[in-house]
Amino acid sequence: GDELIKISGIAKGSGMIAPNLATMLSFIFTNADINSNLLKTLLKRAAANSFNAITVDSDQSTNDMVSIFSTRTIKIGQNISLNDKGVQKFEVALKKLCLNLAKQIVVDGEGAKKFLTIKVINAKSISSAKKIAFSVACSPLVKTAIAGEDPNWGRVIMGIGKSGEKIDKNKISIKFGEFALAENGTPVENIDLNKIKEYMKWDSIVIEINLNSGSDFFVCFTCDFTHDYIDINADYKNST
């Protein structure tokens, strides 16, 4: 029909943010006529690369919830299933909304000044790529390097190594933005340091890790660690 299907959402979170269990609350609302079981499936799929792909400080909490509610007032199609075109369009919109909310949580991270995207590509599996991405994203040394605007790819290598994944170090290539700093495990020569320094001043930084070991990938999102994060959490006092 011509009736408009709407999806709206709100989210709360700034510290103790990590996948699967965080100090995070998100509520999503829609008027689409989709049953609860299918909505649950769609939300789980949307959360995999959004709410479960972010970390502020890698710490967890029990106050973690993402919920979706529907008034079921607007018909979305005849055969309500994952194969229905209306449901597929709805899923695309839901994924965009969840990713937008998840990124806003990271931007609002305690003391955060920079938004950091970690892309792990050409991995042997999605689970391996995810493990490596979060190992780098959760590293205090990586996060403080970003805060200090230092393209320290050695710290990225450290983060990859401590993931525990079996990889060939001679195949690893690393980029900060468009700038290649390491290729096939060795430093890139004749780097334009001035351009890289200018890039590191940006509010949003992308680190690409190419494992050259497969065809799978994973992208996660985090922020830098600043003095403000220390001040916020050092000043916090338990009331008990």
Please provide the spans of the model-predicted regions.
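A structural signal for small-residue-enriched, beta-sheet-centric alpha/beta enzyme cores
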Residues: 1-240
